[in-house]
């Protein structure tokens, strides 16, 4: 967006004269923006403090590199709405169908050929700077000084795949709207065809090497993605011609529709919250004990934890949006909770699993965004927990002061009342 803003300013700078009315409008807009941002920072002060006070990612420092797979995942991202068995979370590889790096290379070739007349430079140069910086950051990485100055140090390199793809799409859209017949990229038809074929093979090779086995076991997918790639790149190389512009648009429209319309709803209806026995029992307990129904889930996954939350329970270990420092201090103790190796586990956004133990109070990083807390029955009492949903029997953890009383046991889901 900054690159687009620079282009708009440069394009209209000489043609537009600013008068007093314009200055007043600009000042009003600036004041309005300052006011909106001030309100946001004031109201979000506590949340921002929690976020920036966390080692991960509040004190994250990224320098990029080794993230080539998400750059080229657009080659097979059209398959994500359909059945893919080799990847559990396709959104981690989601990206825009951008034909990267072809739009960027076409723009570079055009700049070199038109260095004297500087036609279209106002748009192409800012957009290319953004594209190149993002590409270098993702593929090779940068030093700490550049990461700090560019404000990329808080950005995981994989998360740049979408804005990088968006920059390529903006280049394509600009070329579609502004390149004329005289804006020739390559004169030789033979060079265009050979370049299209070689670049398609190179892109497909990289995609196959980094695709987490999405394409390898499905030859038909390779053919489909390869044909889209070859056809699309050839039209981009000839984007100065009206007939090729139309062909590119006619390719992208059905691809966009087929990749969007086929996405199934995550859940239809709310019967999962109204008809399931464990949900009904949870809601019954919540309605009878509105003030003290503090829960945890033991030996479950984050989906069960959040399911309990959706059923109306006050649950400690649902997916946390902010770091719960009080929880960690209670379970681990003041000193241990502040150790660097322990703080590294903390996360602004985290799925929290819990497991009651006989004598261990500890925390473990399972993977990014997911941690596990081990706690004794004494810590359960300190936290004020009254109800536990679990998949195992907890009577073995009874103590002289704490007793787990079973309230519900059906289909592998068990609810306990904690008496102390």
Summary of predicted features, one role per range:
Residues 1-11, 32-46, 89-98, 257-265:
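Transmembrane helices and adjacent periplasmic/lumenal helix-loop junctions
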Residues 4-11, 106-110, 128-132, 161-182, ...:
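Transmembrane alpha-helices and membrane-interface helical segments
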Residues 14-29, 118-123, 185-194, 217-222, ...:
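Membrane-interfacial entry segments at the cytosolic side of transmembrane helices
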Residues 30-34, 91-130, 298-302, 311, ...:
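P-loop NTPase catalytic cores that bind/hydrolyze ATP
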Residues 37-123:
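Periplasmic/ER-lumenal interhelical loops and adjacent helix-loop junctions
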Residues 117-123, 132-191, 202-225:
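Membrane-helix boundary/interfacial segments in multi-pass membrane proteins
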Residues 124, 262-420:
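Soluble catalytic regions of membrane-associated enzymes that act on cell-envelope
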Residues 199-215, 235, 250-271:
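Transmembrane alpha-helical segments
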């Amino acid at each position: 967006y900054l690159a687009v803003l620079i282009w708009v300013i440069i394009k209209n700078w000489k043609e537009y004269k600013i008068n007093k009315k314009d200055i007043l409008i600009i000042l009003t807009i600036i004041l309005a923006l300052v006011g909106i941002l001030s309100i946001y920072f004031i109201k979000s002060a506590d949340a921002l403090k929690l976020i920036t006070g966390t080692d991960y990612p509040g004190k994250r420092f990224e320098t990029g590199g080794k993230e080539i797979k998400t750059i080229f995942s657009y080659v097979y991202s059209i398959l994500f709405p359909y059945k893919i068995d080799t990847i559990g979370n396709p959104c981690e590889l989601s990206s825009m169908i951008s034909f990267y790096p072809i739009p960027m290379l076409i723009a570079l070739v055009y700049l070199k050929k038109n260095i004297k007349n500087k036609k279209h430079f106002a748009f192409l140069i800012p957009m290319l700077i953004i594209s190149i910086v993002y590409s270098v950051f993702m593929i090779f990485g940068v030093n700490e000084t550049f990461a700090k100055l560019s404000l990329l140090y808080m950005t995981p390199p994989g998360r740049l795949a979408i804005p990088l793809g968006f920059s390529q799409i903006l280049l394509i859209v600009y070329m579609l709207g502004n390149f004329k017949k005289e804006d020739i990229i390559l004169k030789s038809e033979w060079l265009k065809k050979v370049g299209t074929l070689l670049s398609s093979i190179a892109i497909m090779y990289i995609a196959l090497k980094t695709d987490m086995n999405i394409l390898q076991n499905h030859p038909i997918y390779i053919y489909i993605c390869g044909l889209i790639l070859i056809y699309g790149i050839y039209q981009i190389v000839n984007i100065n011609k009206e007939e090729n512009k139309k062909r590119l648009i006619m390719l992208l429209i059905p691809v966009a529709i087929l990749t969007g319309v086929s996405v199934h709803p995550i859940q239809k209806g709310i019967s999962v919250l109204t008809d399931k026995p464990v949900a009904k029992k949870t809601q019954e307990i919540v309605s009878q004990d509105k003030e003290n129904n503090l829960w945890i889930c033991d030996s479950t996954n984050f989906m069960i934890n959040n399911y309990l939350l959706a059923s109306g329970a006050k649950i400690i270990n649902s997916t946390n949006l902010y770091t719960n420092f009080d929880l960690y201090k209670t379970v681990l103790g003041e000193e241990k909770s502040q150790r660097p190796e322990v703080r590294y586990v903390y996360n602004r956004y985290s799925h929290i699993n819990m497991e009651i133990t006989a004598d261990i109070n500890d925390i473990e990083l399972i993977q990014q965004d997911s941690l596990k807390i081990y706690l004794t029955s004494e810590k359960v009492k300190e936290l004020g927990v009254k109800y536990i949903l679990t998949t195992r029997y907890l009577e073995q953890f009874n103590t002289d002061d704490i007793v787990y009383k079973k309230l519900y046991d059906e289909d592998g889901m068990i609810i306990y009342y904690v008496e102390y």
